[in-house]
Regions:
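ABC ATPase NBD coupling module
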Residues: 1-5, 56-72, 98, 218-223
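Helix-to-loop junction immediately C-terminal to a conserved catalytic motif
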Residues: 39
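Conserved ABC transporter NBD signature motif
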Residues: 47-55
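Conserved ABC ATPase "signature" region
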Residues: 106-123, 232-233
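Conserved ABC ATPase signature
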Residues: 128-132, 136
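Conserved catalytic motifs of ABC-family nucleotide-binding domains
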Residues: 149
Length: 252
């Protein structure tokens, strides 16, 4: 299916199953607001958000509950997204209980599976967020989002709070998970080099409006707006292969 989105101000696009769509723009461009509207966390004065036939903006509480199992978000700052009072077992199993998935007695085994999937050792099970590195915390946030087996992940600047070598590790993980699980991503970032390497389609926002969209390489090769051209001119020369090569050199 497709998710048609109209939000912020004349913003309209669709996400196809198994596709990675990059959403780029400067701070204040409306990227995160768009994400929150898609998730049903923020209301919109008009337009629509449709997911597999469901009109999200007019959905009942019960419908939204089911929708939020299928659409999960990974935030920019994992420190703010994780409860510091809980250990990883409680943090990652919380969505299982919220959506009534499986039995509580099976939570430990499921959480251990999720930790392994995101590249974390099982002996972290009873650690709290403060006892983890920034990269480990973001992996926990990803594991938590994956717990309910979503179809769409909205990734809001998932790398920007991390150091460059750790960004490379998490980016590599996200690409692998997308391939292995057939996930659909809306990947929000201000880093064009990263978005270019991970996304099939590219959306460019400025001042709450969509100013460019299309296949990623087409937008890079033939930008349709002056704003996009300016973003490309200002783009650092670091491509995703270079980022990943840096991680390998560092032995990460």
């Amino acid at each position: 299916g497709q998710t048609a989105v109209q939000a912020v101000d004349h913003v309209s696009f669709s996400l196809r199953k198994g596709e990675v769509v990059g959403l780029v723009g400067e701070s204040g461009s409306g990227k995160s607001t768009t994400a929150r509207i898609i998730l049903g966390l923020e209301s919109a004065s008009g337009g629509s958000v449709r997911f597999d036939g469901l009109e999200v903006l007019g959905a009942s509480r019960r419908e939204l509950h089911g929708y939020r199992r299928r659409v999960q978000m990974v935030y920019q700052n994992p420190w703010a997204a994780l409860d510091p009072r809980q250990d990883l077992l409680a943090i990652i199993s919380e969505p299982l209980r919220a959506f009534g998935i499986g039995q509580r007695r099976d939570d430990r085994a499921r959480v251990l599976e999720l930790l392994e999937r995101v590249g974390l050792p099982g002996d972290l099970l009873h650690r709290r967020p403060a006892q983890l590195s920034g990269g480990q915390r973001q992996r926990v946030a990803i594991a938590r989002a994956l717990a309910v087996q979503p179809e769409l992940l909205v990734l809001d600047e998932p790398l920007s709070a991390l150091d460059a070598p750790v960004q490379a590790q998490v980016l590599d993980l996200l690409q692998r998970l997308q391939r292995e699980l057939g996930l659909t991503y809306l990947f929000i970032s201000h880093d064009l080099a990263t978005v270019r390497g991970i996304s099939d389609q590219l959306l460019v926002m400025s001042q709450g409006r969509l100013v460019d969209q299309g296949a990623t390489e087409e937008v890079f090769g033939r930008p349709g707006s002056e704003y996009t051209r300016r973003l490309l001119e200002d783009m650092p020369g670091r491509s995703v292969p270079e980022i990943l090569a840096q991680a390998q050199v560092a032995g990460l």
